[in-house]
Amino acid sequence: MFGFGHHHNQAPAAPSDPNQIFKIFCRANENYCLTVRDSAVVLAPVNPKDEHQHWFKDMRFSTKVKDGEGMPAFALVNKATGLAVKHSLGQSHPVKLVPFNPEYEDASVLWTESKDVGKGFRCIRMVNNTRLNLDAFHGDKDHGGVRDGTTVVLWEWCKGDNQSWKILPWGPEAHSSSPGAATACTIGGVPVHTVRVFSAAGEDYCLTVRNGTACLAPKNPRDDYQHWIKDMRHSNKIRDEEGYPAFALVNKVTGEAIKHSTGQGHPVKLVPYNPEYQDESVLWTESKDVGKGFRCIRMVNNIYLNFDAFHGDKDHGGIHDGTEIVLWKWCEGDNQRWKILPW
């Protein structure tokens, strides 16, 4: 995009802390930040407390993956959703969001920053096509500027302020005081955030372990039994029939993994987790988006059986403290739609 001979331009410094959170904004209006809304990447008025505006700049592939100008690759992973920004279909198409698999080198979620294009701003472009850049669609002055909900697309470089970006750490005003906010564990020496798991039928109830069973309980960040590790170590080689990567859900306190039940209507089980052993009975996948960012969680080897908050639908009275998790065929119920998000 800027021609050859720019390898001497310094790349932005990599974050020293993998858990550091960033804000992303463009020169067209620095009072609007990149966020996730209704499963789309848009701009919204800056709000340090809105975790949908918090991003991880994941540099784990930066030493071996670089663009044509030698700039290091990174992924942009949303803190609230765990989704990564993915390349669009081409120029003028909105960028996409997909579940981030930190163990799999997927070029379609990798980006680089250009040299400085003025006042510290840089282009953010596809690692394998530096001619296509993040673009706040119609965010230039001629089209009325950035507004709440401006879509982010890819576009060739037009020297627009709506194509010039900064990725900067949030200040202390963005850091939540909630006890679980910074909870992290390590998998293979890599820091990973614990996650919470909840359904669309009752977002104030989280998956927990109680008396040897997996059930739902009122959300409590202080309750470590509600903290789970989404272990993706087998995802490179194990996928479901739709191509989605497999993962295990391991409880932080008990070290137990959620295991497939004996069939429809039966509760899921908990078993000791052996991370070195490839056991498909503890592996799950997430479906495509089934509405507002929720997804089905289903057996890796039988995607027709899904997590189901038993009798958690409105017709049966909804979610309550102690609602059991069973497997059930897809009935389009809110009690079958789930999110797995960082605490």
From Swiss-Prot:
MF terms in GO: carbohydrate binding
Cited InterPro entries: Ricin_B-like_lectin_EULS3-like (IPR040249), Ricin_B-like_lectins (IPR035992)
Domain Ricin B-type lectin: 194-340
Record key words, sorted: Lectin
Signal peptide: none
CDD domains found in the cross-reference section: beta-trefoil_Ricin_AtEULS3-like
Domain notes: The ricin B-type lectin domain binds glycan structures.
Function: Lectin which binds carbohydrates in vitro. Interacts through its lectin domain with glycan structures containing specific motifs.
Protein name as it appears in the record: Ricin B-like lectin R40G2
